[in-house]
């Protein structure tokens, strides 16, 4: 681990997004609460803006209206000429980019926390998009340490061919927060409490950083996406096997080549196959049936961060 020191600009503008998917209710309810009473998210010298990203989907308690808002923040969609013919979420993405971006510009918000729920048994999860970002690795280390002994996992979605174009990607530092298991359209007090604590610790980290605290070199364990796995299908393209009981709810646990992953209605077990141990995430996620994803394979690795402190101190 290197001990090189990195001076970062202080953080000034932070947004907390809820309702990117309108049926993931923890973020929706927290953001609505903070819009009425923002006391617990305020920190000295920091602008923190709670924001409902997909109000139409929230109103209907559905994931989206026309298309997934969390996949359209790419140059092509953000650059499309404004028109009522555009999908609602593309128009909304352009509005959000105007309010909190523009993406890849000096004017964009410093940090966006995007709050999500999953039906998978993933517990507290932080989603990282850049494995070389000292600031975010330090923040995630702080959150993980603060939450202990409650586990908090880091999912690294850096991949050469899987492009996400997430809602939060317009910020200089995008942070995905994913907490589960929670059914769509349902609120659970334990899940809400965990997400609330993750935001509190994240804001405390930013406050400490802005106040001049130096964070020494650190390392975190992350799970990096390898590939997404579809369900077995018949000639008509319909699902022909379901998640095996021994895989269900086993997110983040080691999965070996001989381990069962699918079960047919005839009772046939289908093993993982391949030649390496992987770590499954988003196992049997309800929202991913339409995306043809039964689970994602990840590999476990360690990321190191240099020490950081604010350039003002």
Swiss-Prot record:
Keywords: Cytoplasm, Hydrolase, Metal-binding, Nucleus, Zinc. N-acetyl-L-aspartate binds at residues 63, 70-71, 164, 168, 288. The keyword Iron-sulfur does not apply. SUPFAM superfamilies: Zn-dependent exopeptidases. Binds 1 zinc ion per subunit. Homodimer. NCBIfam families: PRK02259.1. This is Aspartoacylase.
